[in-house]
Amino acid sequence: MIFKQLFEPESSTYTYLIGCRDTGRAVLIDPVRETIDRDLAALRELDLTLQYTLETHIHADHITSAARLRSLTGCKVAYPEMDGLACADVAVSEISPLDVGGVRLQPLFTPGHTDAHHAYLVDIPGAPHIFTGD
């Protein structure tokens, strides 16, 4: 697995880039509009193709770059199914994990920050990672 944590200082939010070394496919979790050029540069630098953007929740503190990334790269936009967004290409839930090449992201319903908030578990043997958003 390829992993990169990216920080956006204006909104104090993190974007996570996760990639599969074997397939060259990647996902950006919680991408931010103001940092789209940085994110695209990171994908190029790592020789990755963006397969998905994935949100932990609908954000009030920043604007997602998901739609713009979809138009630039052809990636699919994934959101928690409970959000019921018509603009999402893929709906994820605890029973619908997201596979990015050989990397599986398991959605975990974690209400609190928002009513439909989800975290994502990448269960790498010996080194599990969980991405919680904000």
Kindly give the residue locations of the regions a language model identified.
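Conserved beta-strand hairpin/beta-sheet module of binuclear metal-dependent hydrolase folds
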Residues: 1-48, 120-133
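Divalent metal-coordination and catalytic microenvironments
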Residues: 18, 30, 57, 69, ...
